[in-house]
């Protein structure tokens, strides 16, 4: 049961008031899907689909982040990339849009993402993974979490 779970960021503490969490699902957890989940679990922690920090920087993934302000309830934004600066910038944008927390994707095994050093590809470079976590955590006040896997 996660009811009342406290998540601390550098300047913001968040409290989950529901035992329902909807994980980020590429191609599934869009705004419409989240609205359906929210109908049955109003206080659930929902997530966006994973957002490529570089695409967001170039203006291609803005909709996934900017639409947060139109929604109610806690929504986490899952980011992936291999560049600490891009991840920090994307995290700031997500926080400004109202993200409840930022989740760093270090678990996606999709080849085109992992071979560029994103997703589970970060497991192969622990120093880079640490730099990304540090840059994101220092860029935002909301809690930062990491989705990972046990091995590659």
Regions found by a protein language model. Give the residues of each.
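Active-site gating/metal-coordination segments in enzymes
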Residues: 98, 102, 112-113
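Glycine-rich, proline-tolerant flexible connector loops at the mouths of alpha/beta enzymes
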Residues: 50-57, 106-126
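Glycine-rich, positively charged N-terminal anion/phosphate-binding segment
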Residues: 3-9, 25-100
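Alpha-helix-loop-beta-strand connector modules within alpha/beta enzyme cores
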Residues: 66-76, 119-146
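Extreme N-terminal starter segment of soluble prokaryotic enzymes
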Residues: 14-20
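Active-site glycine- and acidic-residue-rich loops that bind
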Residues: 85-86, 143, 148-152
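Short beta-strand segments
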Residues: 49, 78-79, 105-107, 149
């Amino acid at each position: 049961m996660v009811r009342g779970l406290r998540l601390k960021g550098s300047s913001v503490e968040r409290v989950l008031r529901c035992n329902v969490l909807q994980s980020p699902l590429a191609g599934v957890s869009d705004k419409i899907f989240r609205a359906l989940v929210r109908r049955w679990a109003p206080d659930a922690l929902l997530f966006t689909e994973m957002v490529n920090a570089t695409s967001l920087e170039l203006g291609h993934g803005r909709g996934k982040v900017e639409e947060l302000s139109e929604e109610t309830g806690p929504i986490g934004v899952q980011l992936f990339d291999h560049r600490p600066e891009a991840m920090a910038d994307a995290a700031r944008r997500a926080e400004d849009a109202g993200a409840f927390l930022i989740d760093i994707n270090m678990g996606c095994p999709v080849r085109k993402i992992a071979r560029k050093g994103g997703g589970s590809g970060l497991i192969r470079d622990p120093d880079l993974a640490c730099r990304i976590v540090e840059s994101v955590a220092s860029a935002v006040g909301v809690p930062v979490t990491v989705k990972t896997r046990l091995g590659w």
